[in-house]
Design a protein with these regions (language model features):
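C-terminal beta-strand edge segments of enzyme domains
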Residues: 212-319
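Short beta-strand scaffold segments in enzyme catalytic cores
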Residues: 87-89, 99-104, 141, 232-234, ...
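ATP/NTP-dependent adenylation/nucleotidyl-transfer catalytic domains that generate, transfer
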Residues: 279-363, 373-601
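Active-site catalytic loop in hydrolytic enzyme cores
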Residues: 93-202, 268-271
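Cys-nucleophile CN-hydrolase/nitrilase-fold catalytic domain and related Cys-dependent amidase chemistry
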Residues: 24, 32-116, 181-205, 209-212
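N-terminal active-site segment of His-dependent metallophosphoesterases
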Residues: 1-44, 176, 343
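CN hydrolase (nitrilase-like) catalytic-core segments centered on the catalytic cysteine
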Residues: 68-87, 155-252
Length: 601
């Protein structure tokens, strides 16, 4: 982007891409088609992080990693008037594995690698365990292209301020960021997940601070329920947004980068020049922060002084802020329901059709709000002709439940069927277990319903779709190997109160939403009777516990002690119900311990 007086604007294309998991050749072909379609109108095309394979490969990284030379061979010959291309991929380099991005130029009828950046900051929190499967890069450098000096970072590299500063100090006027950012935390009225809002803050801040362009190409699609959201962005050197990609869909987002705006922005806000001037002093300060420097510093606090600081609450446990945590957590449970609906519809469509290769699903319809919401979402995602709703009543099932199940089946126009489970249950009880307890009998009914759903799914070449919510899962309030058995569950990360809100948003009949929640396994018994606390009370407590608050902090923050204790005990006592069966590890290839592959591999 040098010689801005004579150079026309740089035309960039940010590709939101859904790779086929671990199918490198198929993904290269899709990349080639996209390049060919944009070759006459684009100067630079950017594909997301791990475009060759998908992001979550676990131990499969080694099987999908290629060298840069192998990638160039797979890419074949570039089209006429080819743009430059950036591709994110798992790289094999010097017998090691990296999460990398390569900048390719078309020269003399073939692709040439101008630069490779290897991701430095590898996330190892939450669902991420990247450092287990690849090694971190150790270098960040700006490089020359026919469009001027460019720098590349990958995803979390961008969340740290120093790499972008180093590239800008190295002369980069354009920062290219392939990314695979998971959607999470859907706050109301945001229109985007909270992590995408954070992306916009980071990129705008880096662009404005350094007077550079920043472009981010985001992966899109569901990988085993982990949703890449899209939302690619291009930001100008004044921090303004030049382009935004759509959410949850493949797309090519175009932006025009006028190099002249760099000079104008740096004149208006000469922050990069200030940084260059202060850099030697900052380097000396940085050197003084080395771990051993504190020990050499005569002004370092003595041990008893450090203890006094801890006592003042600057480090360690301090008083809980004077806030009502119940109000805070209840507010945190509010959702952007339009965005959640769109996300879950795309999740069902992506996981059932693209990842698993099915067209249809079966849903057990109880007449309760959870199954009503799952059924409605499935019909929106797949069409009602591809959704089979099964009523599976026992003779003591309430007439109200049957009527409500019929109501939602009629509303959604799903394919409806009723199968009575009374005879097989009663026969087993009469012949073998005449003294069976109500709890065991309820579990027996739940497991038989699951068996029937799986058998019907085999008959219909369909997948069972789950209906269990997050509150039930965290409280252990479900029948093991029954409610939790469907392979796909759109509601599993929604608290019960959030399901109620989503149900209202979807237009589920009020009579279903407002009735007391019940598993309808024991006549007249509600969820609250069995759990011992209402969902409205339990959900904010659960949110606090899984967010890292202790029982004591929640009680001091305003929650009722007996309810916090009850919810905490149920959470702690039921971890086993949320895990796969425990296997004795006897080898270095134990499945799920050493041999790791994602569910959609």
């Amino acid at each position: 982007m040098s010689n801005s007086e004579v150079r026309p604007p740089l035309r960039v294309a940010l590709v939101q891409f859904k790779p086929t998991k671990a199918e490198v050749s198929a993904n290269v072909e899709a990349i080639q088609r996209t390049i060919a379609s944009q070759s006459s109108s684009t100067d630079l095309i950017v594909f997301p992080e791990t475009s060759l394979s998908g992001y979550f490969l676990e131990g499969g990284v080694a099987e999908s990693a290629v060298t840069t030379e192998e990638l160039i061979g797979l890419m074949g010959s570039p089209p006429d008037r080819s743009p430059d291309v950036v591709i994110g991929f798992y790289e094999r380099w010097r017998r090691r594995l990296y999460n990398s991005a390569v900048y390719l130029e078309a020269r003399e009828g073939r692709w040439k690698a101008r630069h490779v950046h290897r991701k430095m900051f590898l996330p190892t929190y939450g669902v991420f365990d990247e450092a287990r499967f690849v090694e971190p890069g150790t270098d960040v450098q700006a490089f020359e292209t026919r469009f001027g000096r460019i720098g590349m970072l990958i995803c979390e590299d961008m969340w740290h301020s120093l790499p972008a500063s180093i590239l800008a100090l190295g002369g980069a006027e354009l920062l290219v960021v392939p990314s695979a950012s998971l959607a999470r935390d859907f706050s109301p009225a945001g229109g985007r997940s909270r992590n995408l809002e954070r992306w916009e803050q980071i990129t705008a801040g880096a662009a404005l601070e350094h007077g550079i362009f920043v472009i981010v190409a985001q992966l899109v699609g569901s990988e085993g329920g982990k949703l890449f959201f899209g939302g690619s962005i291009a930001v100008g050197p004044d921090g303004s947004f030049l382009a935004r990609g759509p959410l949850l869909e493949e797309a090519v987002t175009l932006a025009s980068l006028d190099a002249g705006s760099i000079n104008r922005s740096r004149m208006a806000s000469p922050l990069l020049a200030d940084l260059e001037q202060m850099l030697p002093h900052l380097q000396r300060s940085l050197e003084s922060t080395r771990p051993h420097a504190v020990l050499e510093d005569s002004h370092a606090p003595l041990e008893n002084e450090a203890q006094e600081v801890v006592g003042e609450g600057l480090v360690g446990e301090g008083p809980v802020p004077d806030k009502d945590l119940g109000i805070i957590h209840a507010a945190e449970l509010n959702l952007d329901l339009d965005l959640v609906e769109k996300t879950l519809i795309e999740f069902i469509r992506d996981e059932v059709r693209r990842r698993r290769g099915f067209e249809r699903v079966v849903v057990g319809v109880s007449g309760g709000v959870d199954s009503a919401v799952s059924l409605a979402l499935a019909c929106k995602a797949l069409g009602p002709e591809n959704v089979y709703g099964f009523r599976l009543p026992y003779r003591t099932s309430s007439q109200e439940s049957l009527e409500h199940a019929a109501l939602i089946l009629d509303m959604t126009q799903a394919q409806a069927q009723t199968i009575e489970i009374s005879d097989p249950i009663d026969l087993y009880v009469k012949e073998y277990e005449p003294e069976i307890s109500p709890l065991r009998k309820g579990n027996l009914m739940a497991r038989l319903r699951s068996i029937i759903l799986f058998d019907q799914s085999a008959k219909l070449n369909a997948l069972p779709l789950g209906t269990g919510n997050k509150s039930e899962r965290l409280l252990g309030y479900f029948t093991w190997h029954a409610d939790d058995s469907p392979p796909i569950n759109p509601l599993g990360d929604l608290f019960k109160t959030q399901v109620w809100a989503l149900a209202q948003h979807l237009g589920i009949p009020e009579v279903i939403i407002e009735k007391p929640a019940t598993a309808d396994l024991v006549k007249g018994v509600t969820d609250e009777d069995e759990i011992g606390v209402s969902y409205h009370a339990a959900d904010p407590i659960l949110f606090g516990l899984v967010s890292g608050y202790s029982v004591e902090e929640l009680v001091r923050g305003g929650f009722k002690e007996d309810e916090v204790e009850l919810v905490s005990k149920r959470l702690q006592a039921t971890h086993w119900k949320r895990e796969l069966p425990t296997v004795a590890v006897l080898s270095s290839s134990a499945i799920g311990e050493f041999y790791l592959r994602p569910v959609d591999y």
